[in-house]
Amino acid sequence: MTQISGSLVAIVTPMHEDGSLDFPSLRSLIDWHIAEGTDGIVIVGTSGESPTVSVDEHRELIRVTVEQVNKRIPVIAGTGGNSTTEAVELTAYAKSVGADASLQVVPYYNKPTQEGMYLHFRKVAESVDLPVILYNVPGRTVADMSVDTMLRLAQVPGVMGVKEATGNIDRAAQLIKAAPASFKIYSGDDPTAVALMLLGGHGNISVTANVAPRAMHDLCAAAMRGDVETARRIHMQLLSVHKNLFVESNPIPVKWALQAMGKMAGGIRLPLTPLAAQYQEVVRASLQDAGLLS
């Protein structure tokens, strides 16, 4: 199994102003991330606007990412959803083109029970020989996977870990304490990622890494080796970035930030809209404060 740890960018999906996919910019972003030390690419997750890409686009985004990365760092394909059958099919495709793992979000809208979540994720893991990272983000899905359900799933072959995005450090500590050593716990919440990693977490699936790949790599490396002072310093440097990349729904602010940095165009798909004018200077100031924009 490929080692997956450190700063894992929840990469955006670049789009032209008309909303069409911008593959040249995606390839350029990937190369920039690798040069800046990013430890893994998570493609077509929340930050990648997975709900508004078609099935064909979803597949092509995974294929192009795997091709561009070319085995330099791990690729984690966002292939989850609220249909178990579709999640299995998309995960099988990701495996066929060479992804290293899949990210499986808690099924949203249909609000499964804890048993339903368990059976859903077990079905995906048993159907496709590709490591599964669970993704718990109740702020998006409404349904919240319990620690007990995560621990049950940790016993399922093929389930390698979880992206825990609640930001609840007490919950993360309980999970880290009780989980087997083979089960990896990743933060999915930039403001609390340092704390989770200092408790024994294995990395951070990060929005901030989109704009600060080198800093996030250094932060994760420091936290995971127990270098509290370095991790604290970088965290404080990025504090306003962590906060202000969520002044509107992710990935609205981070896509605007990348456009301001000259990394891509600012296209985004409805029902998401471009960053409101009153927040643009807030985000710009955060980037400048962190030394990411002159």
Swiss-Prot record:
Protein family according to the UniProt entry: Belongs to the DapA family.
UniProt KW Lyase keyword: yes
Cellular-component GO terms for this entry: cytosol
Entry EC number(s): 4.3.3.7
Subunit and partners: Homotetramer; dimer of dimers.
GO biological process: diaminopimelate biosynthetic process; lysine biosynthetic process via diaminopimelate
Catalyzed reactions: L-aspartate 4-semialdehyde + pyruvate = (2S,4S)-4-hydroxy-2,3,4,5-tetrahydrodipicolinate + H2O + H(+)
HAMAP family cross-referenced by the UniProt entry: DapA
Residues involved in pyruvate binding: S47, I205
Subcellular location(s) per record: Cytoplasm
Function, in words: Catalyzes the condensation of (S)-aspartate-beta-semialdehyde [(S)-ASA] and pyruvate to 4-hydroxy-tetrahydrodipicolinate (HTPA).
InterPro entries per record: Aldolase_TIM, DapA, DapA-like, Schiff_base-form_aldolases_AS
UniProt entry keywords in alphabetical sequence: Amino-acid biosynthesis, Cytoplasm, Diaminopimelate biosynthesis, Lyase, Lysine biosynthesis, Schiff base
Identification of the protein by name: 4-hydroxy-tetrahydrodipicolinate synthase
GO molecular function, one term: 4-hydroxy-tetrahydrodipicolinate synthase activity
Pathway participation: Amino-acid biosynthesis; L-lysine biosynthesis via DAP pathway; (S)-tetrahydrodipicolinate from L-aspartate: step 3/4
UniProt cross-references to PANTHER family, sorted A to Z: 4-HYDROXY-2-OXOGLUTARATE ALDOLASE, MITOCHONDRIAL, DIHYDRODIPICOLINATE SYNTHASE
Predominant location category: cytoplasm
NCBIfam families (UniProt xref): dapA (TIGR00674)
Residues flagged as site, Part of a proton relay during catalysis: T46, Y109
Transit peptide keyword on record: no
Residues annotated as the enzyme's active site: Y135, K163
